Amino acid sequence: MFINEYFHNIDSKGRVIMPSKFRDEIGEEFYITKGMDECLFVYPVSAFIQMTEKLNKLSLTRRQARAFSRVFFSGASNQEIDKQGRFLIPQSLRSYADIKKEVAIIGVSNRIEIWDKEKWEQYSNDSSLNYDDLADGLNDLDL
């Protein structure tokens, strides 16, 4: 499981260090794709396959399902961690998430999110994201 947040710089080639606590769990190979809220989603191969299976079950006659699948898969990139613990964030994905020099790498259960550091700080400090209010909205999940 991925938890916590880490901050790293991107080098001139678009590479960033995968936090050491995430390396064993993510494995040698993983997928990075467009996420929601202007961030990137990083999935271990097994979680990406599960997501693929779920998306493949959606009806092709639903416009929203087709559109989501297009965005999700067209932005996906298969990546590996090099010997220095780095991986490449392709330019197209850096542009999508408006990633500049520093990133926040966030553990979110079965996936990792990558944010531009400034955007993550704005998001996580947003007063409208009151934790208690968010939890109240999840009453039906019996947490």
From Swiss-Prot:
<feature type="domain" description="SpoVT-AbrB 1">
    <location>
        <begin position="5"/>
        <end position="47"/>
    </location>
</feature>
<feature type="domain" description="SpoVT-AbrB 2">
    <location>
        <begin position="76"/>
        <end position="119"/>
    </location>
</feature>
<keyword id="KW-0677">Repeat</keyword>
<dbReference type="InterPro" id="IPR020603">
    <property type="entry name" value="MraZ_dom"/>
</dbReference>
<keyword id="KW-0805">Transcription regulation</keyword>
<protein>
    <recommendedName>
        <fullName>Transcriptional regulator MraZ</fullName>
    </recommendedName>
</protein>
<keyword id="KW-0238">DNA-binding</keyword>
<dbReference type="GO" id="GO:2000143">
    <property type="term" value="P:negative regulation of DNA-templated transcription initiation"/>
</dbReference>
<dbReference type="GO" id="GO:0000976">
    <property type="term" value="F:transcription cis-regulatory region binding"/>
</dbReference>
<dbReference type="InterPro" id="IPR007159">
    <property type="entry name" value="SpoVT-AbrB_dom"/>
</dbReference>
<comment type="subunit">
    <text>Forms oligomers.</text>
</comment>
<dbReference type="InterPro" id="IPR037914">
    <property type="entry name" value="SpoVT-AbrB_sf"/>
</dbReference>
<dbReference type="GO" id="GO:0003700">
    <property type="term" value="F:DNA-binding transcription factor activity"/>
</dbReference>
<keyword id="KW-0804">Transcription</keyword>
<dbReference type="InterPro" id="IPR003444">
    <property type="entry name" value="MraZ"/>
</dbReference>
<comment type="similarity">
    <text>Belongs to the MraZ family.</text>
</comment>
<dbReference type="GO" id="GO:0005737">
    <property type="term" value="C:cytoplasm"/>
</dbReference>
<dbReference type="InterPro" id="IPR035642">
    <property type="entry name" value="MraZ_N"/>
</dbReference>
<dbReference type="InterPro" id="IPR035644">
    <property type="entry name" value="MraZ_C"/>
</dbReference>
<dbReference type="InterPro" id="IPR038619">
    <property type="entry name" value="MraZ_sf"/>
</dbReference>
<keyword id="KW-0963">Cytoplasm</keyword>
<dbReference type="GO" id="GO:0009295">
    <property type="term" value="C:nucleoid"/>
</dbReference>
<dbReference type="Pfam" id="PF02381">
    <property type="entry name" value="MraZ"/>
</dbReference>
